[in-house]
Design a protein with these regions (language model features):
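Extracellular/surface-exposed low-complexity segments
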Residues: 2-7, 21, 279-306
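Intrinsic-disorder-associated, low-complexity terminal segments enriched in Asp/Asn/His/Tyr and depleted
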Residues: 4-8, 106, 158
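Disulfide-bonded cysteine-rich modules in secreted/extracellular proteins
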Residues: 10-21
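Acidic, glycine-anchored loop motifs typical of Ca2+
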Residues: 26-35
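Structural signature of tandem-repeat unit edges
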Residues: 45-86, 96-109, 119-132, 142-155, ...
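Consensus positions within tandem repeat domains that build extended binding/scaffold surfaces
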Residues: 89-93, 111-116, 134-139, 157-162, ...
Length: 306
């Protein structure tokens, strides 16, 4: 979909959805679309249309809802001038050839499954005002290599970046308080991550991140729960430091995890722990407490932090 306005203030449409435009936006049925008619459009539904580019639609000045679900030939989108549009649920669902998109600067959230299965998308600039990234927002964006999450984001939904198999690095801003289940699951190229201090729960977060070597926590971490196999099958992870605030731990199938530095003075409750051949380092004043706690099965592996 692409069009231009000429001096007569009429829209000229091009591409494979010309008839759709005239059928839906030409209110007076004169075979033309005026700027007034275009400004009255709040929703455009192009689901499953065979379009390749979506540019020049800034003239729909009051456009709020755009649906491009399953537009499998779509490659390029420019929404920079559509200041009222929302990046809604499933907006570009399985647009597998989408490789370039420009988003409007004033959006506040990325909807659920908005870019699900956009496997050709290599990069995306998320506007600074965004505060929430929804469930499965970028699930299966297998060409996405790096992404900067804006500083105002506070919530990253379940499976938000799951199966982003080329993702090597990601910046999680300090304001984030919640990271959903499997948010980074099966990100097999991800090598390092830093968890902001306001996050209190990590649940099944990094399963199958086979290249993850470094996990760090911001100073003053308020993390309480590391559960549901948070690092399941993280084969490259050999060492980890557990913040002093942690109260409960589930960890399994970290087959190469050799050193665990556990800083809580009160031993965290151990629900499920299927790791072998590791050394657990704990505060010296808490050595006996750990050996007589739910960690007692690993009595001989517990040593003091030097």
């Amino acid at each position: 979909l692409c069009f231009n306005y000429f001096k007569d203030r009429l829209a000229r449409f091009y591409g494979t959805v010309v008839q759709y435009c005239y059928d839906n936006f030409d209110v007076n049925k004169d075979g033309k679309v005026s700027k007034i008619e275009a400004s009255a459009v709040a929703k455009i539904d192009l689901a499953r249309q065979e379009i390749k580019t979506l540019t020049g639609i800034g003239y729909f000045s009051n456009l709020e809802i755009l649906n491009c679900k399953e537009c499998h030939e779509l490659t390029t989108v420019d929404l920079s001038n559509n200041l009222k549009v929302r990046i809604g649920d499933e907006m570009f669902y399985t647009c597998s050839k989408l490789s370039k998109i420009v988003l409007p600067n004033n959006i506040l959230e990325i909807g659920e499954s908005a870019f699900y299965g956009c496997s050709s998308l290599k990069n995306i600039d998320i506007p600074d005002k965004v505060t929430e990234i929804g469930y499965s927002a970028f699930y299966g964006c297998s060409s996405l290599k790096n992404i900067d999450i804006p500083d105002k984001v506070t919530e990253i939904g379940d499976s938000a970046f799951r199966r982003c198999s080329s993702l090597m690095s990601i910046n999680i801003p300090k304001e984030v308080t919640e990271i959903g289940r499997q948010a980074f699951g099966s990100c097999v190229s991800l090598t390092s991550i830093n968890i902001p201090k306001r996050v209190t729960r990590l649940e099944d977060l990094f399963s199958n991140c086979s290249s993850l070597r470094s996990v760090t926590f911001e100073k003053g971490s308020q993390l309480k729960y590391m559960v549901e196999g948070v690092f399941c099958d993280c084969e490259a992870l050999t060492s980890i430091e557990i913040p002093a605030s942690v109260e409960m731990i589930d960890m399994y199938y970290c087959i190469n995890l050799a050193n665990i530095y556990c800083y809580p003075s009160i031993p965290p409750i151990l629900n499920d722990f299927r790791c072998k051949n590791f050394v657990l380092y704990v505060p010296s004043q808490s050595l006996e407490a750990y050996k007589n706690s739910s960690w007692s099965e690993y009595y001989s592996s517990i040593k003091t932090i030097q």
